[in-house]
Amino acid sequence: LYLSYGNIVILLNLSMNDLKNNFIEFAIKEKLLRFGDFTLKSGRNSPYYFNTGLCNSGSKLRSLADFYANYIHQNELNFDFIFGPAYKGITLASSISLQLDNVFSIDKPFSSNRKEEKTHGDVGTLIGSPLSGKGLIVDDVISSGSSIKESINIIKKNNAEPISILVALDRMELGKSKSATSEIESENGIKVHSIINIDDVVDYLEKKEKDSDCFLRMKKYLDEFQR
């Protein structure tokens, strides 16, 4: 379901189910989504790991941005600017902005934060467009939600409004009382969108590898930690 023009890969008019399955296959092929034994930042052991930082070439990054752009277009997300938290969000915001314009003629400014404030030249804590109006926050994955919460605060401090959040993968894991997604939505009144969530991955594995050790470990893990 890819439409190719030379080396350019564009996704057009896919159903959401097709978009999800194509994204999972892309993520596995490019090793953004890996299965094995991993230790997360939280210290929790996980049978899978997701990292869009491995989209480290023009073609891979373009393909990744196409999935975000298609999701935005299909779900008619309305916003005035795109904000990507440092560091991975910097390339995400810029590439998504580029592909929205290339594929759908939707031209939106983008911005990111600096980890440290710049005190000379282009001073301040922001890179890119000034924040004005309603913002879409883009990131690769939502686990604890810490970078998303920081982004919400940055946008509000700049007198703009965070209106929506879009991540590639929602891990849907239980925190202290509920998932990070539920916490962000209930505390801020902001909808969290994801191209896929971990249930989509498990459903995909069940169809492809129902009796595999990978599927069984994933199912056991989610039964313990998912909300």
State each model region's role.
Residues S143:
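Active-site-proximal mixed secondary-structure blocks
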Residues L1-V138, S146-R227:
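PRPP-associated nucleotide enzymes
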